Amino acid sequence: ANMEAQGATCVTAWIGDGARVWQAETEAFDRVLLDAPCSTEGRFLADDPETTRYWSRRKIKEMRTKQRRLLFSAVMALKPGGTLVYSTCTFAPEENEGTLAKALKTFGDAIEIVDAGLPGTGPVAASVMPGLAEWNGRAFPEAVRRSRRVLPDGLLEGFFVARIVKRESTVRE
């Protein structure tokens, strides 16, 4: 019903373990949207301590592991030439830029992070910034800067988004 409301007419939703999609649907999809489970830092409210109740460093590590598995599966399920959008509602670099860096290391030149295409002008523009170049002394690949961090404001909750194009097959025989 949500897809119909948005005017999407050619959509396949996967119900099941997303980390296994690629095993059943290897290089089958033109477009993939991976809105990954995360530590939800972008949804914290300063005046509501309840929003941080389940946050911990351990939660970030747990989510990072899950996200890496999901992103691997999403890339493997994407057709060469296809586009994947990876998003989270957290600011943790381990879950965002770190996850992208791991994918680049795993897939090499078969994937490319391209500009996320968020507006450079208008009411949201002041809240949009490029992905981090480094975190805690660890440099990320330059391509990771093409991702976008959106800071929370009166219009939006905070989130992270990256657009990845699959340049060639990732199936290795």
For each feature predicted by the language model, list its residue ranges:
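S-adenosylmethionine
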Residues: 1-173
